[in-house]
Curated annotation (Swiss-Prot):
Organism: Olea europaea
Family annotation (InterPro entries): PFN, PFN_euk, PFN_sf, Profilin_CS
Subunit structure: Occurs in many kinds of cells as a complex with monomeric actin in a 1:1 ratio.
Recorded GO MF terms: actin monomer binding
Domain of life: Eukaryota
Note: The variability of the residues taking part of IgE-binding epitopes might be responsible of the difference in cross-reactivity among olive pollen cultivars, and between distantly related pollen species, leading to a variable range of allergy reactions among atopic patients.
Sequence motif Involved in PIP2 interaction, residues: 84-100
The keyword Translocase is assigned to this record: no
Family of this protein: Belongs to the profilin family.
Pfam family, one: Profilin
Disulfide links within the chain: 13-118
Residues that bear Phosphothreonine: 114
Name of the molecule in the record: Profilin-4
């Protein structure tokens, strides 16, 4: 399966039990900041934004004082899982980022999608990729 198929079929799909509820944007990005696959709606990000995200995975709490920035959008960092998941909130939407051995899985959402639904979709694919050694 191509990386784009993972984004299209596993991240940008209807959320289980909620037809027409799906993430706003999604991507799979290598630890080096190279985009493996992304939805058409995923924001263009700056290298320093990706560096900040990677630093937070290695030094949990790094982004808390400044917020998480992606594509010029600032998210307030909320409870995640140190070294494994970063979660952010902005207004009625937010972001979930799951770290795997080689990549970061991104999901961005707006209402009516809930934070829990975004977490389920992003972390589900991330856990699967970890099981595959990726």
């Amino acid at each position: 399966m191509s990386w784009q198929a993972y984004v299209d079929d596993h991240l940008m799909c209807d959320i289980e039990g909620h037809e027409d509820h799906r993430l706003t944007a999604a991507a799979i990005v290598g630890h080096d900041g190279s985009v493996w696959a992304q939805s058409a709606t995923f924001p263009q990000f700056k290298p320093e934004e990706m560096n900040g995200i990677m630093t937070d995975f290695n030094e949990p709490g790094h982004l808390a004082p400044t917020g998480l920035h992606l594509g010029g959008t600032k998210y307030m960092v909320i409870q995640g899982e140190a070294g494994a998941v970063i979660r952010g909130k902005k207004g009625s939407g937010g972001i979930t980022i799951k770290k795997t051995g080689q990549a970061l899985v991104f999901g961005i959402y707006e209402e009516p999608v809930t934070p829990g639904q975004c977490n389920m979709v992003v972390e589900g694919l991330g856990d699967y990729l970890l099981e595959q050694g990726l």
